[in-house]
Curated annotation (Swiss-Prot):
Source organism, top-level taxon: Bacteria
GO annotations of cellular component type: small ribosomal subunit
Family: Belongs to the universal ribosomal protein uS4 family.
Residues in S4 RNA-binding domain copies: 97-160
GO molecular function, one term: rRNA binding
Gene3D superfamilies in the record: Ribosomal Protein S4 Delta 41, Chain A, domain 1, RNA-binding S4 domain
Protein's recorded name: Small ribosomal subunit protein uS4
């Protein structure tokens, strides 16, 4: 399946929650009514979604949130299932460790899509080496930095300014002046994605 390139607000309305696909400069909450699905008539009143439908919807929501397509998402699940511990929590930890997501969490990109583009365009380094693979898995202690020739890009400067106003997650440490940061640790489950019910995804793939 190709990556969705249409209106971002429509995806958040479809999932009934903000997927953080738009910059915080223009809150998607101002444009999307999350209790109404896209379309002329919106959500059908009184309609009950099946268990399978709920599970599928949750998977779609997380895929769209992190910008991951089905084949790759399935691989993440299989890896999460092989690891010790809770499969659902492992899945989210893998998604959070993607380089594009870490770049977003550090505030170098105002959205995950923008962060993915920065990585793909070789604007970022990991431990001093250029990495242009958005799915690259960042490890605790890795240093992420904007390449010197990209530091003055307006979108990066503006994204960092916005991130400093909003606040950074506890698991990253940023030096905005140098446009670099450290991925201190993979976050615990209770530190992120509070509106994600990963157990539904586990149930779906366990069918």
């Amino acid at each position: 399946m190709a990556r969705y390139l249409g209106p971002k607000a429509k995806l958040s309305r479809r999932e009934g929650t903000d997927l953080f696909l738009k910059s915080a400069r223009r809150s998607i909450g101002d444009k999307a009514k999350f209790d109404s699905k896209p379309g002329q008539h919106g959500r059908t009143s009184g309609a009950r979604t099946s268990d399978f439908g709920l599970q599928l919807r949750e998977k779609q929501k997380v895929k769209r949130m992190y910008g991951v397509l089905e084949k790759q998402f399935r691989r993440y699940f299989e890896e999460a299932d092989r690891r010790k511990g809770n499969t659902g929590a492992n899945l989210l930890s893998l998604l959070e460790s993607r380089l594009d997501n870490v770049v977003y969490r550090m505030g170098f990109g105002s959205t995950r899509a923008e962060a993915r583009q920065l990585v793909s365009h070789k604007a970022m380094t990991v431990n001093g080496k250029s990495v242009n693979i958005p799915s690259y898995m960042v490890k605790a202690g890795d240093m992420i930095a904007v390449r010197d020739k990209s530091k003055k890009q307006n979108r990066i400067v503006e994204a960092l300014q916005l991130a400093q106003q909003v606040g950074m997650p506890a698991w990253v440490e940023i030096n905005a002046e140098k446009a670099e940061g450290t991925f201190k640790a993979v976050p615990d489950r209770d530190q992120f994605a509070a509106d994600v019910n990963e157990s539904l995804i586990v149930e779906l793939y366990s069918r």
